[in-house]
Design a protein with these regions (language model features):
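Feature for extracytoplasmic/surface-facing segments of secreted or surface-associated proteins
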Residues: 1-232
Length: 232
């Protein structure tokens, strides 16, 4: 399977492309994931990756793939690729948030993903129900009734994506501020944006106001939570 993808930061019509990012594509396992291939984005943030599909990829034993894009020691974004895997993907903060929540219970202490086939495939479906990895936008499920503007889910995804985007886009002190309010349950400070959002997903009651306030620095993902929807 040939995957044509891109890595960028921010939502809307003009996201910031991320050139020179290392894109690692993994096949999740019951233990450590298999690194299937690794490529680098060009100056426009685009990449092409060839993924040999597992011969054991069946309906009863689906193989689950995911991509992690790393630009610097602090910037790490993710997208779920399902069991196909997808042939087109746009990796950004929104796909990272969706993946963190969908796979939350499968992240190991080193932030790799591990689990058995069927539960992992269900998590992949959950990720796609939150954000379309092909378009890099909120899924149709999230954008339409009974979700849409009738619940806070779409806006919450936007706010959390904006929280990560400030760090990704190099806003002064944004990464430091993000990592300070997103420790793991055991108190370990994260060092990447992916680790930070996974910690948020696993510890939803921790530092809620501090995390929410970071979402106002960069506001390129819309809709986002308004003041009366926030915790303050």
């Amino acid at each position: 399977v040939v995957i044509n993808g891109s890595v960028s930061s921010g939502g809307g019509a003009s996201p910031q492309v991320i050139g020179g990012a290392t894109v690692s594509i993994y096949q999740a396992q019951t233990v450590a994931p298999i690194l299937v291939t690794q490529v680098t984005t060009d100056s426009n943030g685009n990449f092409t990756a060839k993924v040999p599909v597992s011969t054991g990829n069946t309906t009863s034993n689906p193989a689950t793939y995911y991509a992690v894009a790393t630009k610097s020691p602090s910037i790490q974004l993710m997208a779920s690729l399902g069991s196909g895997p997808l042939t087109a993907v746009k990796i950004n903060e929104l796909t990272t948030v969706a993946s963190a929540y969908a796979y939350a219970q499968f992240f190991q202490s080193n932030y790799t993903i591990a689990g058995t086939a069927i539960p992992l495939s269900i998590a992949a479906g959950m990720a796609e129900n939150l954000a379309s990895a092909q378009s890099g936008t909120a899924s149709t499920v999230i954008q339409t009734s009974p979700n849409g503007y009738e619940t806070n889910t779409w806006s919450a995804l936007g706010t959390l994506s904006n929280v990560l985007a400030a760090c990704t886009q190099g806003v002064s002190n944004a990464c430091t501020n993000l990592f300070a309010v997103t420790p793991s349950a055991t108190g370990v400070t994260p060092t990447t944006t992916l680790q930070a959002i996974v910690n948020i997903a696993l510890n939803p009651a921790a530092n809620v106001s501090g995390i929410y306030n970071l979402g106002s620095v960069v506001t390129s993902y819309t809709p986002a939570l308004t003041a009366n929807q926030g915790p303050n």
